[in-house]
Amino acid sequence: MSSCSVENQNPNHSSPLNWSNLWLKNKKALDHVSSTIRRRSFYRKPPPPPTPQSPPPPQQPPPPPQQLPPEVTVVPLSPHFQQTHYNETLLPDSPEVVPSHDFISLLSDETLLQILSKLPDRSQRNSNSLVSKWWFNLQGRLVRSVRVFDWSFLTSGRMFTRFPNLIDIDLLHGSVISSSHLKSCGLSLGREFGPFCIESDVFSPNNHTFRPVNEVDSVLKCLATAYPNLQRLVLLNSSEIGLLSLAEGCPNLQEMVLHHCHDQILHGIAGFTNLQILKLIGTIDGFYSSLVSDIGLTILAQGCRRLVKLELRGCEGSYDGIRAIGQCCQMLEELTFCDHRMDNGWLSALSYCENLKTLRLVSCKTIDQIPGLDEHLGACRLLERLQLERCRLCEKESLRALFLVCRSVKEMVVKDCWGLTDGIFLNANLCRRVKFLWIEGCSRVTTEGLESVVLSLKELESLKVISCKNMKDDEVSPVLSMLFYSLKDLKWMPDNRSVLSTSLVGSGMGKRGGKFFKKLQI
């Protein structure tokens, strides 16, 4: 028997068993080996052809065929296997080598978007868009909010391809036609507008300062097609036709800020049945003026029954319009009046807002000059917060009626209101459930007037007094001092001296001048 032979290990078997019989009879094993070789192999580029200057390498004679043992049989591979693995180099258990050095290109768009979305810094995200055109397009897909300044960027369609996934669009600045050569001077209109540069001959009551209504309506139709998932929109000078087309294409719109609003436009607003937050600006003194009356408020209330927050700025109306809002919008929780032009008697309609939790009056020259009898006012039983900011509070009966309607509030904020004296502020005693009181910028209220109010608030837990110059530290009585001691939270900075002394504690800045002038004394 030859040394390369395979002896039969089974004595009961008559014929000897060799390796060739094992491979030929077991086809599954052969296929498994072939597939394993394919999986572990990798392709390499063929070597470059030799240059014509260099002589070809000498060919070595093929090695003589080796004499195989008589009982060992060579199994030829299939033609398909030979054709597939022609010019391959097989290295067992070697990692796959990528011929290109750009491993990021192997990532899918979804994976890279998830990585880029985890970056906390917005400036870092913007710089990433400069890496390549691919990253530039991906960065545009991550943007959710846009404020349009260049109207041509919108009308040309570039915004739709650059930012395909927007849910928040602000068209206010782009809707105003401003002068490009008057950059140094501007007209500031508050937080909503910011600075605008408008020529004196262009700025006129004929609305030549704004984009035409038909242009805005055509843009709204494009937005309805491009962004069906739009959730927030700020626009100016549109019509009910454009709003109705937007309502059909964007059924999930939840928040809208509508400038230059009037009764006719509110027919289109009523088409947004899922609207939850709405801000209507009817008139801004010196900029534009439009009419929002009880008719428009009634149309709005009947169409947008899911409103949670409503702000009326520069809007007219009366008892009927506010009552319609309270009866139809049962989910309304926050109501804001900014610079209102309401007729007398509207205050008693607030009692129809049964689920109202926050009432804000901002920049109001008056509240309600003729509120009516106390028994007709009613009350907002679930109201928790009352905020008065930059209002004129010099009418005692008007403020008293407001406190009667809001007598169940737990938080009261009075900021930068003029005309408020001790006698008028005394009506705050009607709100006996107040736990948090914040008074700021009320220069005519004295320490005595504050004491007469806070001592009647038996549930008071927190007090903030800021920039009220008629309140003095040395005027605090022992009773008021004991009340301060029992509060959970107290912030007492009635004048600028108190603010400055509090901010300079431990710095020593307030004493250096005194040492200097002592040296100059003779």
PLM region spans:
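N-terminal adaptor-interaction module of cullin-RING ubiquitin ligase components
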Residues: 1-285, 298-301, 319-323, 347-348
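Short, flexible helix/strand-to-coil boundary loops that buttress conserved ligand/catalytic motifs
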Residues: 139, 247, 311, 336, ...
